[in-house]
Amino acid sequence: MRRALLTGIQCHACRNNVVRSFVSVSGVTFMPLASGSWSASQTRPPPLSRNFSSQHAKLFSSHPSDNAEVAVDPMPEKDITEETVKPPEEPEEHIPWYLQEELEATTSHPLRKQQPLPPLPENPPPILNGLLEHISIDLGLDDISLLDLRKLDPPPALGANLIMIFGTARGVKHLNVSADRLCRWLRTTYKLRPDADGLLGRNELKIKLRRKARRAKLAKSAKSTLTAPDDGITTGWICVDVGTVEGGQFRKPEEEARKVGFVGFGTFVQGTRIVVQLMTEEKREEVDLEGLWRRTLERNSLENEGLPQPQAEEPPQEAGDIHKPSSVTPAHISHRVSHAAQISVNYEQRRGISTGSCQYRDLEEDGLNYAPINPDGTIKLPELISESTPLTSLTSRLRNISPYEAIYHLGQDVNDTNSTTFLEQFYRKLSKAPDDLASAQRIKLICIAIMLHHPGYGKTDLFKVTQEHFISNYGVTPPQFLEILDALLSFKPDLTSDPPNLLLPAADMELALQTIDHVGLRGIDLLNSTVWMKLFVGASFRVPVCPVRDLMNAPVIGNRTPVSLDTYETVNRVQTRLLKVKTAAKIELSANEYLSLLRVLFDHEWYSMFWDTWEEIALAGMPRDKSLYVFLFQLHAESDGWEGWKSTLLNCIPMMERENPPVYMDRELAEVIARCLAIAHPEIMDRVERNEPSPLVRLWHRCRITIEKEVPLRGAQNPPSTMS
């Protein structure tokens, strides 16, 4: 297995097989993705003839042959004489081929259907349509998108009434040539003065490339390598400022001047400013400038409309009885609330709800926010959208409210389209949108509902909609693929069942693998840290476990849940194969991904692999800062069964001050270290009372002094009970 990975990892087909290789061990049956039914006549092209004979010419000729019978309608003699009287028409003058005017092809190129132009925004400037066609057709840029930033208030630093266009070049040379031709085309056609940041002139690019090749040749002859990371050529990003063009502004200067309370100075901006961002594919994924502007635009629209913001709360209101909405039955409400409690909301405070109704007691236990009451007794929920809200921002509004309100706005099930105001307006805008955008937004809506554990939205519904999206040959972006994968791999363990349900169902894993297989055929990179980490966590236990032979009579060990030895070994075989894939593909993890990997290894009691991964973080050149050490000691303080590795854990304490930058002990670290000492050495209090001259006692006194001296920023807190 290891040799096959190392030798065949460069092949695209082998990459797909590597990702799916651990499925056979876990017992999941992999079925190929269903595709549309195509006949053999559609997939097999007709044979081509070598030459065009006269027989083929006769088939397409409009003149009848000599042997064919011609049916002639009887005509009056008067008409015949009139025709004979008419003088013969003069023959048309022959025009040579080099003097004939070239006619543009009326049929569009088939590749244009694969990459359509983005739709024009409201009130576009006249130049915009021609500019998009020139960028796509003449320059050959891919993945063109458009952001309308004219409604940003305050305007961005590039200027007011801004429209930003993004395009992907095939390489560095194509990037420079496209930017140069775009500037020349704007100067010639529209008499504009564009400014291109990062553009190298034609001769300058050739000179730098020639010098770079010469330096590489000299370095090769000297048996050395070029260490300069930035040579000034491979920036991969050129920003072309087209300038201010006529038309496209939303408000006229006279209307701005008449605004009440308008204070300012300077001149009004007339017209629209257009900026074209040209990047290579690698630079566009690295910078994600488009995503940054989209989030800024969505946040600005929320602020302007006065909608609730993330991590914000409304002022407290007078509590009262909660009644069900008029369109939802009590059974549905109670069922939805129980599912909504599974999503933790990151609010600074949580308020309980005082109510006498038994069927809504879950609201108080879950600590959800207070829902105000209408005069007629129905629940008053905030309006999510308005008529001016763009379609791409609708689903994002669901993430900015509480889970209970989001589940209410999502209606009964996946087929519900008009039970709530949100669904009614969402599907109305969906019917007017392009087919590919409508399909992508519907997938996003179902993904959010599954992550909220809505009872009416299932993973089979998501897979069905995703399958239709693939068969329709719509585009799939890496963020969209990761969102689908998160929804398919989402799972909440059930500790109340007998036996406890701690693993993702095999059917859900099969749906995720089929989606991965089809996305890999579209050219999306699968052997990266993000996809690998999602598969690794998805195939693992979601709580700390301990393997036992007799599950019925197994004792409880701390916070660990006993599982059968066969299930534990099956999961470990899958995890071992995934770890081999990571090593063979040389996948580099980020700091947050290392934290997830450490937690999974610790929950599975893989302590040897756990400490190897801890050392791997330092070998990868990542700083092990205070947050990482707090996570390490907190992980051990919340669980048992690691006492055999207590010396390894305690050796990390003197290593903290040797880190770069060093990590010094404060109150937060001292508290978790003291808890770990109490678990690893239960007799530590007796040693402290006897005042033994041991390193453990000195470490205990050091933690106690740090806790007593340092006052936390949030106010004084009592020391842990183990210190008393």
UniProtKB/Swiss-Prot annotation:
Keywords for the protein's UniProt record, in alphabetical order: Membrane, Mitochondrion, Mitochondrion inner membrane, Transit peptide
Disordered: annotated span: 36-76, 300-323
GO biological processes: mitochondrial gene expression; mRNA stabilization
Compartments where found: Mitochondrion inner membrane
GO cellular component: mitochondrial inner membrane
Membrane topology classification: Peripheral membrane protein
Family: Belongs to the ATP25 family.
Name of the protein in question: ATPase synthesis protein 25, mitochondrial
Organism: Ajellomyces dermatitidis (strain ER-3 / ATCC MYA-2586)
